[in-house]
């Protein structure tokens, strides 16, 4: 299995892993760009790729940029059949502009295997029941006492 990368301009760099056990490949900016404070910007990587069949690439933030500069990524899926230019959407959650320079590591790419089952529409009562049921939005992260109180409050409504 290989990840094929084609350079689209002279500033492009191939993705690299920071260590032999790193899950992600660092992605490098091929252009200078200012991400405005509390804003966003699309950063060109200057390359296109051939993702291995049976996988997709997920674009994720680099932890250092997130912690030190308040940057995160968005719109981060590269499908197996996409062959166009790869760009990274950066969100700047800080109150200061962030300047990207050519060669900066702006995100990481993680290859993940995918499963694409056939969609089958069924009635609600045909779904397998589970212990969790319809509990969501933090329902599994509360202690038993809080859960009991919430259940009692819902029963009164």
From Swiss-Prot:
Organism: Yarrowia lipolytica (strain CLIB 122 / E 150) (Yeast)
Enzyme class: hydrolase
GO-annotated biological processes: dUMP biosynthetic process; dUTP catabolic process
Residues the record lists as binding dUMP: 63, 76, 79, 82, 87, 132, 137-138
Basic and acidic residues composition bias: residue spans: 143-157
Catalytic activity: dUTP + H2O = dUMP + diphosphate + H(+)
Name recorded for this polypeptide: Deoxyuridine 5'-triphosphate nucleotidohydrolase
Region (Disordered): 125-157
């Amino acid at each position: 299995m290989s990840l094929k990368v084609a350079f689209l301009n002279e500033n492009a760099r191939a993705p690299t892993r920071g260590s032999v056990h790193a899950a992600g490949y660092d992605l490098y900016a091929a252009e200078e760009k200012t991400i405005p404070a509390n804003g966003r910007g699309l950063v060109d990587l200057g390359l296109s790729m051939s993702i291995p069949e049976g996988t997709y690439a997920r674009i994720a933030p680099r932890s250092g940029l997130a912690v030190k500069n308040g940057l995160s990524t968005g719109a981060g899926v590269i499908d197996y059949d996409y062959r166009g230019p790869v760009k990274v959407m950066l969100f700047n959650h800080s109150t200061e502009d962030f300047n990207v320079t050519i060669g900066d590591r702006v995100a990481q790419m993680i290859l993940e295997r995918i499963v694409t089952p056939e969609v089958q529409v069924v009635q609600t009562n045909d779904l397998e029941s589970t212990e969790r049921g319809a509990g969501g939005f933090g329902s599994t992260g509360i202690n038993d006492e809080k859960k009991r109180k919430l259940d009692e409050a819902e029963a009164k409504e």
